[in-house]
Amino acid sequence: MPTINQLVRKGRKSKVVKSDSPALNKGYNSFIKSQTNVSSPQKRGVCTRVGTMTPKKPNSALRKYARVRLTNQIEVTAYIPGIGHNLQEHSVVLIRGGRVKDLPGVRYHIVRGALDTAGVDGRMQGRSKYGTKRPKAAKK
């Protein structure tokens, strides 16, 4: 426990909170060609690479990912959720924050059903998370 005199001489240090998705906290001013501190919930970007990677132990799979160059000139790795996708190089995508626990370095998700990304086909439950339209009611 510090004395009052110690606190007067050297106050308490506040904890530094680090962002989980730092690329969303930067903007880009193309007129002066520099980054700005403008936060946004999602960002647009162009796929520079689409591929699969294997997760950490003890899981085993081929997880789909895309390397995305954002509008603020930062390049990030984003996870492609759902079964099947139509993304390839130069596809324009929307990313949101949210890491994938078993893929190191993947801190972002691609939003399905936005821009060039198609929704998941044949999905009936949790459709809003995968950009799937409501199926037409069957005729009797």
Swiss-Prot record:
UniProt keyword rRNA-binding present: yes
Origin: domain of life: Bacteria
Pfam families registered for this protein in UniProt: Ribosom_S12_S23 (PF00164)
Modified residues (3-methylthioaspartic acid): 102
Example of a GO biological process term: translation
NCBIfam families, per database record: rpsL_bact
Annotated family: Belongs to the universal ribosomal protein uS12 family.
Protein name: Small ribosomal subunit protein uS12
Organism (species): Exiguobacterium sp. (strain ATCC BAA-1283 / AT1b)
